[in-house]
Amino acid sequence: MKKGIHPEMKLVTVKCACGAEHTFYTTVDNIRIDVCSNCHPFYTSGGKGGVLIVDTEGRVEKFRRKYGDNY
């Protein structure tokens, strides 16, 4: 490996919108996420199986207003 060209890795706390915090090694200083394994329906649904939709930006509602619920 060439010296002096690689970014410095550091331990960073990643903060989720649900309040959970995870620690990772990364080159980025600050990371904020919308969904993590503590709040994502895939991990929290308890194996119910249905359709899981995570919509934090209102895209599903915009689609339903435009095309209706029967699409």
UniProtKB/Swiss-Prot annotation:
GO terms for cellular component: ribonucleoprotein complex; ribosome. Zn(2+) binds at residues 16, 18, 36, 39. It comes from the Bacteria. GO terms for molecular function: metal ion binding; rRNA binding; structural constituent of ribosome. Its cofactor is Zn(2+). The keyword DNA-binding does not apply. Keywords: Metal-binding, Ribonucleoprotein, Ribosomal protein, RNA-binding, rRNA-binding, Zinc. Part of the 50S ribosomal subunit. Binds the 23S rRNA. HAMAP family: Ribosomal_bL31_1 (MF_00501). Belongs to the bacterial ribosomal protein bL31 family. Type A subfamily. This is Large ribosomal subunit protein bL31. The lineage of its organism: Bacteria, Thermotogati, Thermotogota, Thermotogae, Thermotogales.
